[in-house]
């Protein structure tokens, strides 16, 4: 019987690129992917993936589990828009918490060896002076972080009650080829590339002194695989990457150097964490993470790819659940 892995969110950045990596480096595994194509694109999916177009909340995902009997499950599917989440609360909790609960149920029923769940550094909130350590008690400041933290707790309870093995990974500002650059609510580097491709000024919210740590997608792929397969990763929570720190202004200057973008427009500040710097030693020690690609190198590769992409319409949220307090730059 062939070995099988499931990747949810297989049309997105993490999912599509991990599928490529497994197919190339672990040919003994069959890759099955689920995605509803709400935030990713079918052309991102490797043709060797057995693709199921499904909504994790409303469609019968149990059929996929029953047919395949997965060894490992990588649950990446999520709409990761921290700033937008206060205005789409219902969708945020359905898309993250309810979907994850269904995945957890099926992993338990079918005896999956390990569930790898991608959480977020948004669970930390402001952290300890802007530094995020896995030992800290999470204090999220937005509904997206709340939802992801609830998912983490549910997965840990599933381990305690049902023996479901897991590794919770908290990636940080992962970027690269196959990222959705057409979504105006998330992924600052992709937003800037879209703006430059469409001859718009690149936008910075607030003073631009916010600090972020960026990770190129290629550096994260083998560590994600190790999260599923390494014995030491069992029942661990691990920040992934985030070794290279930049202010938003510094990141914009690097992007301008790579792309030739010239104009910067400053917008009103948002409700967000000022400094977001993870500790990363556990990802090195347990997952074998290596920081191989600096921001300029990664943006150069991403920019080569972005210039070849179709001129899709920009994604605009059709109707907010809550209009009160929404930022002027997001008003429809």
Kindly label every feature range from the protein language model.
Residues 123-124, 174-176, 220:
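Conserved sequence/active-site signature of Rossmann-fold short-chain dehydrogenase/reductase
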Residues 17, 25, 79, 88, ...:
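Generic structural signal for alpha-helix termini and adjacent loop/cap motifs
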Residues 126-128, 177-180:
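Short beta-loop-alpha junction of Rossmann-like oxidoreductase domains
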Residues 150, 154, 158, 188, ...:
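Hydrophobic alpha-helix immediately C-terminal to the catalytic Tyr-X-X-X-Lys motif of short-chain
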Residues 1-171, 320, 326, 330:
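N-terminal Rossmann-like NAD(P)+-binding domain of SDR-like oxidoreductases, especially those catalyzing
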Residues 140-147, 171, 181, 185, ...:
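The catalytic Tyr-centered alpha-helix of NAD(P)H-dependent dehydrogenases
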Residues 55, 197-332:
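C-terminal substrate-binding subdomain of Rossmann-fold SDR/epimerase-dehydratase oxidoreductases
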């Amino acid at each position: 019987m062939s070995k099988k892995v499931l990747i949810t969110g297989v049309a997105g950045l993490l999912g599509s690129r991990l599928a490529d990596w497994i197919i190339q480096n672990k040919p003994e595994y069959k890759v099955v992917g689920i995605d509803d194509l709400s935030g990713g694109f079918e052309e991102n999916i490797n043709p060797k993936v057995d693709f199921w177009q499904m909504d994790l909340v409303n469609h019968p995902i149990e059929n996929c589990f029953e047919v395949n009997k997965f060894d490992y499950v990588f649950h990446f599917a999520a709409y990761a828009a921290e700033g937008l989440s206060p205005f789409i609360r219902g969708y945020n909790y359905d898309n993250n918490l309810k979907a994850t609960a269904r995945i957890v149920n099926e992993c338990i029923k079918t005896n999956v060896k390990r569930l790898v769940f991608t959480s977020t550094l948004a669970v930390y909130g402001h952290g300890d002076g802007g530094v995020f350590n896995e030992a800290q008690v999470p204090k999220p400041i937005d509904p997206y972080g709340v939802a992801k933290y609830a998912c983490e707790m549910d997965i840990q309870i599933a381990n305690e009650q049902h023996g479901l093995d897991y590794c919770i990974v908290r990636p940080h500002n992962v970027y690269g080829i196959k990222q959705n650059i057409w979504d105006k609510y998330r992924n600052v580097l992709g937003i800037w590339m879209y703006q430059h491709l469409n001859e718009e000024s690149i936008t910075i919210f607030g003073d631009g002194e916010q600090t972020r740590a960026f990770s190129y997608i290629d550096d994260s792929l083998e560590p994600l695989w190790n999260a599923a397969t390494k014995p030491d990763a069992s029942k661990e929570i691990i920040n992934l990457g985030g070794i290279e720190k930049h202010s938003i202004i510094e990141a914009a200057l690097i992007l301008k150097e790579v792309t030739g973008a010239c104009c910067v427009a400053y917008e009103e500040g948002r409700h967000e964490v000022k400094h977001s710097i993870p500790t990363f030693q556990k990802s090195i020690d347990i997952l074998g993470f290596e920081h191989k690609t600096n921001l300029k190198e990664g943006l150069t590769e991403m920019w080569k790819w972005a210039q070849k992409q179709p001129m899709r319409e920009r994604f605009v949220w059709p109707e907010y659940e809550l209009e009160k307090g929404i930022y002027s730059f997001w008003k429809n």
